Amino acid sequence: MRYLVDTHTHTIVSGHAYTTFLENVQEASNIGLKVLGTTDHGPSMPGGPNLFYFNNFKVMPRKLKGVTLLHGCEANIIDFKGMLDIPDFTQKKLDVIIASLHDVCIRPGSVEENTEALINVMENPYVDILGHIGNPSFPINEEVVVKKAKEKNVLIEINNGSFVSRKGSEETCKKVANLCKKHKVNIIVGSDSHVCFQIGRFPKADNMLKEIGMPEELIINNEENKILEYLKNKGKLKDLNLD
């Protein structure tokens, strides 16, 4: 399958990634992506940016080198109540927010605690995507989370990077994907790139989705406008004309 969108990418601003914003945009353009999300880690990630970075996205272009640019954040869930490490004032300015659990920002809890964190964060209207919930370091009740995502219109990410960097993720990601298929929940495939050469490349995630027969209509990033319409319907991207 051809993917035209990657909403989960990092720049050197994240502290442990290796390419700049412009290098990422150039690579996205080179490989034919139509939409690129820059979603650097929130400030509680060691080495991550401060809030001024996220509050200053107004200086950034909306389009560059033929690519529509989404300016967002992979925000860290910092407690089991679903609190994020960026305030509402910042959240409402962003085009896209991925909410993720990272063990350097919150201790892994029980299945019940981890599930509660994801359920609670989906009550936040600014959250668009749940990041890498197939991470076995944070065991969850996958079916409860997937059903809640459908109720709250939150996208479930299938994270290609998890297949490599988070040991044991392959089976949990497949379980999540099968539940999304069962309950007809929209998914988005993300590279979680930390260097530009990973952008728009989802081979392991794509192979798994083909294996389980994921319906293409449930995959948000196989068309340019699906993600843009999704975000506009949530009241975002007011400056972007889709006509």
UniProtKB/Swiss-Prot annotation:
InterPro entries xrefs: Phosphatase_YcdX_put, PHP_dom, PHP_phosphatase, Pol/His_phosphatase_N, Pol/histidinol_Pase-like
Entry keyword set: Hydrolase, Metal-binding, Zinc
Any single Gene Ontology cellular-component annotation: cytosol
Sequence positions that bind Zn(2+) 2: H16, H41, H194
One Pfam family here: PHP
Enzyme Commission number(s) of this protein: 3.1.3.-
Signal sequence coordinates: none
Cofactor note: Binds 3 Zn(2+) ions per subunit.
Descriptive protein name: Probable phosphatase CLD_1129
Record organism: Clostridium botulinum (strain Okra / Type B1)
Lineage: Bacteria, Bacillati, Bacillota, Clostridia, Eubacteriales
